[in-house]
């Protein structure tokens, strides 16, 4: 800390101002404000962050000392003002808590009561954010013995004013000789660390991480130092290196990483104007700019900043893991420790952990840097890697060069890992944490910490990739197989499971570069296969899977799966059942590893339907595609069998069906046709709208809620329906719109509740939905109010340019309207209102919400059921949609892109 810094705080000038004022409050406030401005300017000018936070602590020391002098403390030997916690370490950020302990010698301290109260009142009046406690030395000992947080705070203390001897006495009575011996303290701190990590999902890669509390955050470094202080009395990282727990290079890395997080935290406090440690979307752009990250694309600048953040916290996490394991080996050592068991000439087990037999193993036999992970996969009883061996791995990573990568011993070992029955994900994760994976596969190293600034991808690319491999592995476990029965069944019968793991490793490896990441990844995958001398068939499959890993989900979510041509085109693209099996399993794992909330019953049903229909097409033969007429005949025949068994007159059925049109039978299965037909035939002629609701437990819709509406056609039918559903808090995931020749509308919606689940067995909720829709459709002139819901905080920060594309389908007499835009409450209801205003008919719709974005496809016609052909009409339609999409967006949102 500085001894003198007149620009920051001039004691003489301050005391002169105090003498001139009747009340000291104004002088104190002025000094604090001016010093804060100086420190913020120095931060913007790039002043050393360590110096800045020490300077702020020095400033507060001076302010507190001057405030202390304003009062008569009588017997000054019996009281002391002590800084504890972070302030006790001499570290203060702009809005950090100033933790104070007023330490008393005797329990009887009535003589100080009035001065203490007035002193604390002054601190609050001048705007200091203080946390204070008033204790005697004996009370400190009593509370420290009972509370881990209290003893931790007291270990980090400085006397600001009063008797230093009191603090020394406090340290003596709270030492390891009296309480919290180092072993007990270490176990408590380790448990505290694990609980804190679990609170933040045990990952360094949260979208909005906490720079203090998240894994790899500042609290991890502090935990290591607390344990070291309790065990060895070391005060800082440099001293920790002196004890042999850190190499000098590791000390420098940890210190620079801490400095980076200090800069981020300082900027957070400064921008938020309060003690804010969460790196929220609200602040990421501003902090990126403040710290010098720039790009023509602001989103890219944020991604660069966050990638640096994630890499820093990963480094901290790795080094703290290393130190904590060292502590375990030293502090927890007992008489039974030291048992070793040989594994091979290079490795042995030491108390259940693998270790190198000597310090030269990796230097003499570099292939051992891969062998160690294969051994752990082959011996699942191994608990982990000894700290010294982790350090040896880190020290010898530089030996992994092109010669190493092309050595057949190493390529064989790497492939061997993927053939192990268990431990693939766990050991790939270890390889990534120790920096081996990114060295062996430089293309993987590029995606470490690579984030995508959106709500769809909640993990960095490397974390997502390893999560995908974890999901693939879990598909073989019974609890998971019950949730994903088809994917689990297929995973169990893949001829070479290692190929899907390798495809998963490379599927997103091209992200963060210019160009199509699927194509870039396929190029990298091909080179990998060649370098590892994989058979030609294996290589072709891996490359094809990487290149096409998005095709199945895109087709399922954006195409009309009831159209035989869509199925036939997809089957032609896939080519054979083996590829289909691999692609389906990879797609399921990819979606679940991207964002768990994306996997809902409706998305599952779409993929399962596409898989089943494609499999049938492949077995029938691509030269014999199922045509529309054949599909209609099959559906009608099966539905009629159901109805006749239930006692329905076939003639009544035939008469009804003659009015429904071909599209109806193409878009519904036999069970639904029978369900609809039975209800329609029983509906009185003047019974009003027919609204049917059921849990769609059929194979293709399992778990969703299907709403079928049959009513006389009216111009505003879709607009009224979606507005009413918005009022009912329903999310529409699919819409099938059909108008019969008798001018009746037959609409089917697949909906989920706002929480992503189906309606379930909830008669009250079903009645609420049925009554709400019936009332809205019975009185369409009372158009349901589009509820103005608050845009969620996170959505506000993702204003990307909306895209509106209008094109005509050469094979079908419809116009396709594609909309990609930021998600906003009530958006679909607003689009429905536009269709009403433009006199448009909706024939079909595919609705998809992916994080903060919607990707919706509408199949529309004009009032005469013809495709849109007037360019001016299309232009006006686009403009109207654009206005709705941009309503409420931030002014810096990019222009909307329209295509026709």
UniProtKB/Swiss-Prot annotation:
Question: Per the entry, what modulates this protein's activity?
Answer: Uridylyltransferase (UTase) activity is inhibited by glutamine, while glutamine activates uridylyl-removing (UR) activity.
Annotated ACT domain residues: 706-784, 816-900
Q: HD domain location, by residue?
A: 461-583
One GO biological process this protein is involved in is: regulation of nitrogen utilization
A GO molecular function annotation here is: [protein-PII] uridylyltransferase activity
Keywords recorded for this protein, A-Z: Hydrolase, Magnesium, Multifunctional enzyme, Nucleotidyltransferase, Repeat, Transferase
Keyword check for Transferase, yes or no: yes
The EC number(s) this enzyme carries: 2.7.7.59, 3.1.4.-
Q: Which PANTHER family match?
A: BIFUNCTIONAL URIDYLYLTRANSFERASE/URIDYLYL-REMOVING ENZYME, BIFUNCTIONAL URIDYLYLTRANSFERASE_URIDYLYL-REMOVING ENZYME
- NCBIfam families noted in UniProt: PRK00275.1 (NF001366), UTase_glnD (TIGR01693)
Role description? Modifies, by uridylylation and deuridylylation, the PII regulatory proteins (GlnB and homologs), in response to the nitrogen status of the cell that GlnD senses through the glutamine level. Under low glutamine levels, catalyzes the conversion of the PII proteins and UTP to PII-UMP and PPi, while under higher glutamine levels, GlnD hydrolyzes PII-UMP to PII and UMP (deuridylylation). Thus, controls uridylylation state and activity of the PII proteins, and plays an important role in the regulation of nitrogen assimilation and metabolism.
Give the protein's recorded name: Bifunctional uridylyltransferase/uridylyl-removing enzyme
């Amino acid at each position: 800390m500085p001894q003198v810094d007149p620009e920051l705080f001039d004691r003489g000038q301050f005391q002169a101002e105090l003498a001139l004022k009747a009340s000291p409050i104004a002088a104190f406030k002025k000094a604090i404000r001016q010093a804060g401005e100086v420190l913020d300017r120095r931060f913007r000018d790039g002043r050393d962050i360590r110096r800045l936070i020490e300077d702020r602590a020095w400033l507060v020391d001076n302010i507190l000392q001057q405030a202390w002098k304003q009062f008569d403390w009588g017997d000054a030997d019996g009281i002391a003002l002590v800084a504890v916690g972070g302030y006790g370490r001499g570290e203060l950020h702009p809005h950090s808590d100033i933790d104070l302990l007023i330490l008393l010698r005797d329990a009887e301290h009535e003589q100080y009561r009035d001065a203490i109260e007035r002193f604390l009142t002054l601190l609050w009046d001048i705007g200091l954010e203080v946390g204070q406690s008033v204790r005697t030395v004996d009370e400190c000992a009593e509370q420290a013995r009972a509370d881990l947080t209290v003893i931790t705070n007291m270990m980090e203390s400085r006397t600001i004013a009063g008797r230093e001897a009191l603090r020394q006495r406090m340290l003596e009575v709270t030492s390891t000789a009296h309480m919290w011996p180092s072993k007990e303290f270490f176990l408590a701190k380790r448990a505290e660390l694990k609980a804190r990590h679990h609170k933040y999902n045990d990952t360094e890669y949260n979208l909005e991480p906490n720079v203090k509390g998240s894994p790899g955050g500042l609290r991890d470094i502090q935990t290591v130092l607390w344990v070291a202080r309790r065990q060895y009395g070391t005060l800082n990282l440099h001293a920790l290196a002196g004890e042999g727990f850190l190499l000098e290079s590791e000390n420098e890395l940890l210190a620079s990483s801490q400095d980076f997080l200090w800069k981020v935290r300082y900027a957070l406090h400064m921008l938020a104007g309060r003690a804010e440690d969460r790196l929220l979307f609200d602040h990421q752009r501003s902090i990126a700019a403040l710290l010098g990250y720039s790009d023509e694309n602001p989103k890219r600048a944020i991604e660069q900043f966050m990638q640096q953040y994630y890499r820093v916290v990963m480094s901290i996490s790795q080094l703290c893991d290393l130190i904590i394991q060292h502590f375990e080996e030293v502090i927890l050592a007992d008489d039974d420790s030291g048992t070793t068991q040989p594994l091979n000439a290079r490795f042995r087990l030491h108390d259940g952990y693998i270790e190198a037999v000597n310090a030269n193993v990796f230097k003499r036999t570099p292939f051992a840097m891969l062998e160690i992970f294969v051994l752990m996969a082959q011996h699942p009883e191994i608990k982990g890697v000894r700290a010294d061996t982790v350090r040896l791995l880190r020290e010898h990573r530089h030996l992994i060069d092109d010669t190493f990568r092309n050595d057949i011993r190493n390529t064989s070992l790497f492939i061997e890992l993927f053939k192990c029955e268990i431990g693939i994900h766990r050991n790939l994760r270890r390889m990534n944490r120790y920096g081996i994976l990114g060295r062996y596969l430089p293309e993987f190293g590029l995606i470490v910490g690579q984030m995508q600034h959106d709500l769809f991808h909640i993990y960095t690319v490397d974390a997502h990739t390893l999560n995908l491999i974890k999901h693939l592995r879990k598909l073989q476990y019974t609890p998971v197989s019950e949730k994903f029965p088809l994917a689990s069944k297929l995973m169990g019968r893949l001829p070479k499971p290692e190929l899907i793991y390798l495809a998963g490793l490379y599927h997103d490896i091209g992200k963060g570069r210019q160009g199509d990441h699927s194509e870039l990844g396929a190029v990298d995958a091909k080179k990998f296969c060649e370098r590892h001398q994989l058979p030609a068939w294996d290589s072709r499959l891996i490359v094809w899977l990487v290149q096409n890993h998005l095709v199945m989900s895109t087709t399922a979510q954006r195409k009309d799966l009831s159209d035989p041509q869509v199925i036939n085109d997809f089957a032609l693209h896939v080519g054979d059942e083996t590829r289909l099996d691999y692609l389906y399993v990879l797609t399921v794992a990819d979606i679940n590893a991207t964002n768990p909330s994306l996997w809902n019953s409706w998305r599952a049903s779409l993929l399962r339907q596409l898989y089943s229909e494609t499999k049938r097409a492949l077995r029938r033969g691509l030269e014999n595609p199922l045509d529309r007429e054949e599909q209609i005949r099959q559906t009608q025949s099966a539905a009629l069998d159901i109805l006749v068994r239930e006692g329905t007159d076939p003639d009544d059925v035939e008469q009804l069906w003659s009015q429904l049109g071909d599209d109806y039978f193409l878009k519904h299965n036999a069970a639904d046709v029978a369900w609809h037909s039975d209800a329609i035939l029983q509906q009185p002629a003047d019974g009003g709208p027919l609204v049917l609701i059921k849990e769609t437990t059929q194979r293709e819709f399992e778990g969703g809620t299907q709403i079928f509406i049959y009513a006389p056609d009216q111009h505003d039918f879709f607009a009224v329906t979606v507005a009413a559903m918005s009022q009912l808090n329903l999310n529409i995931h699919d819409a099938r719109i059909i108008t019969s020749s008798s001018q009746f509308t037959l609409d089917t919606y697949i909906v989920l509740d706002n929480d992503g689940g189906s309606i379930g067995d909830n008669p009250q909720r079903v009645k609420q939905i049925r009554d709400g829709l019936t009332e809205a459709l019975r009185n369409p002139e009372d158009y349901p109010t589009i509820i103005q819901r608050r845009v969620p905080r996170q959505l506000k920060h993702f204003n990307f340019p909306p895209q509106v594309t209008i094109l005509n389908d050469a094979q079908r007499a419809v116009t396709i309207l594609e909309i990609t835009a930021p998600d906003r409450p009530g958006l679909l209801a607003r689009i429905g209102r536009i269709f009403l205003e433009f006199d448009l008919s909706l024939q079909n719709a595919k609705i998809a919400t992916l994080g903060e974005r919607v990707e919706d496809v509408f199949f529309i016609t004009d009032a005469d059921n013809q495709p849109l052909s007037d360019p001016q009409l299309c232009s006006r339609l686009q403009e109207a949609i654009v206005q709705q999409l941009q309503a409420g967006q931030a002014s810096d949102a990019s222009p909307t892109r329209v295509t026709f």
